[in-house]
């Protein structure tokens, strides 16, 4: 992804980001979600296939064409993304960090469009880790402002295109205006079923497991359940991903060549297939996503069983 920016525009944009982190109005990059194809596979037209971990298609559902490299019966139901490399992408181009994050929003837009059109039912994005509060305040402010602006700009489109929004993580530490917008987005889109977009903000996989255990312990203390009732299914029901029909990703993609999970969906990724891309997130587009999906479709998911 390339930018044609005059030097003056870069510094003007950077000044605007740093001086007004709560109200970014940079027009250089806009997040406008293209319409998802009306014949795209809808979530409620699929039947879960537990053995293969892919979506079985209801024959009555009209389908949009897939790239010839992909097989529809092997498409993952749930894709999770660790979107890494925005800052490095900007640094390589001599641009402010803020413009790297702006470019990352464009990549998000494209992946949402592809998921909706290719029949992926859940897309989970790791937008902000609980550890990211350790970054410089100006960068955190930029991230919060970008998230708020993008969500506000796209909420109407999400509602129209059948995209359901859910947020996981501790939202209590987010700016009040962002908390209010999140509540509005969740309420507005709760009946949508074409694509479930889950955004992890101020999220920690370890904390998710801890809070689930605390909730279960309290239920035991209150005589709601007994210790013998505790199993993996019960724990999963108390995780923050309990809002998702398919809470465990079939495929995790991480960009920018980093080979770690970074405290993301630690319980849910137990049997997920992993794909690591060397592309920085702003450069991750259709070709890179297609490569990841092709790799996924060539694998045999055994869930601890012998290979066939």
Swiss-Prot record:
Belongs to the UPP synthase family. Its main location: plastid. The keyword Chloroplast applies. The lineage of its organism: Eukaryota, Viridiplantae, Streptophyta, Embryophyta, Tracheophyta. Uses neryl diphosphate and geranyl diphosphate to catalyze the cis-prenyl chain elongation and produce polyprenyl diphosphate with a chain of 55 carbons. This is Cis-prenyltransferase 4, chloroplastic. It comes from Solanum lycopersicum (Tomato). One of its GO terms (biological process) is polyprenol biosynthetic process. Keywords: Chloroplast, Magnesium, Metal-binding, Plastid, Transferase, Transit peptide. Its cofactor is Mg(2+). Its EC number is 2.5.1.-. Pfam families: Prenyltransf.
């Amino acid at each position: 992804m390339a930018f044609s920016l005059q030097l003056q525009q870069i510094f003007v944009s950077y000044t605007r980001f740093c001086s007004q982190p709560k109200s970014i109005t940079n027009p250089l990059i806009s997040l406008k979600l293209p319409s998802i194809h009306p014949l795209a596979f809808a979530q409620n037209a699929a039947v879960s296939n537990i053995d293969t971990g892919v979506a079985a298609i209801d024959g009555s559902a009209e389908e949009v064409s897939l790239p010839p490299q992909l097989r529809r019966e092997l498409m993952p139901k749930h894709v999770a993304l660790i979107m890494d490399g925005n800052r490095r992408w900007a640094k390589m181009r001599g641009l402010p960090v803020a413009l790297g994050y702006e470019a990352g929003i464009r990549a998000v837009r494209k992946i949402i469009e592809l998921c909706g059109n290719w029949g992926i039912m859940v897309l989970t994005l790791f937008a902000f880790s609980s550890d990211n509060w350790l970054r410089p305040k100006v960068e955190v402010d930029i991230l919060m402002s970008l998230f708020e602006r993008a969500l506000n700009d796209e909420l109407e489109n999400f509602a129209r295109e059948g995209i359901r929004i859910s947020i996981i993580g501790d939202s209590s530490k987010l700016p009040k205006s962002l908390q209010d917008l999140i509540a509005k987005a969740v309420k507005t889109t709760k009946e949508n079923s074409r694509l479930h977009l889950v955004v992890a903000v101020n999220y920690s996989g370890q904390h998710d497991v801890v809070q689930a255990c605390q909730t279960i312990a309290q239920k035991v203390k209150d005589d709601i359940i007994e210790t013998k009732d505790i199993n993996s299914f019960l724990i999963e029901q108390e995780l923050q991903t309990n809002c998702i029909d398919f809470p465990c990703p079939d495929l995790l993609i991480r960009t920018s060549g980093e080979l770690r999970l970074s405290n993301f969906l630690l319980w849910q990724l137990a049997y997920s297939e992993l794909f690591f891309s060397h592309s920085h997130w702003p450069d991750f587009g259709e070709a890179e996503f297609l490569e990841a999906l092709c790799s996924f479709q060539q694998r045999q998911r055994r869930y601890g069983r012998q290979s066939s």
